Curated annotation (Swiss-Prot):
Protein name listed in UniProt: Small ribosomal subunit protein uS15
Subunit structure, interactors included: Part of the 30S ribosomal subunit. Forms a bridge to the 50S subunit in the 70S ribosome, contacting the 23S rRNA.
Regions crossing the membrane: none
An example Gene Ontology molecular-function term: structural constituent of ribosome
Function: One of the primary rRNA binding proteins, it binds directly to 16S rRNA where it helps nucleate assembly of the platform of the 30S subunit by binding and bridging several RNA helices of the 16S rRNA. Forms an intersubunit bridge (bridge B4) with the 23S rRNA of the 50S subunit in the ribosome.
Family: Belongs to the universal ribosomal protein uS15 family.
Name of the gene: rpsO
Organism: Clostridioides difficile (strain 630) (Peptoclostridium difficile)
Keyword RNA-binding: yes
Length: 85
């Protein structure tokens, strides 16, 4: 189970920062990883799979925005989350 407050504290720029792209990407990544585990055991859950694809698309858009605005922050975040190889 994801602990939102810990993720916000770790990736946020200030106390209670929930709107920055870094926090949003980290929260989406945690939810995506959790849903991936669910879909491994429930292969026919297509409703959840659609939600997963929507989350992945939203994370992709946020990553593109962050890459454009703050390249160093983008590189640090993907290294910390282990997203790109």
């Amino acid at each position: 189970m994801i602990n939102k407050s810990e993720i916000i504290k770790e990736y946020g720029r200030a106390e209670g920062d929930t709107g920055s792209p870094e926090v949003q990407i980290a929260l989406l990544t945690a939810r995506i990883n959790e849903l991936n585990g669910h879909l491994k055991t429930h292969k026919k859950d297509h409703h959840s799979r659609r939600g997963l694809l929507k989350m992945v698309g939203r994370r992709r858009n946020l990553l593109a925005y962050l890459k454009e605005k703050d390249l160093e922050g983008y590189r640090a975040l993907i290294a910390k989350l282990g997203l790109r190889k």
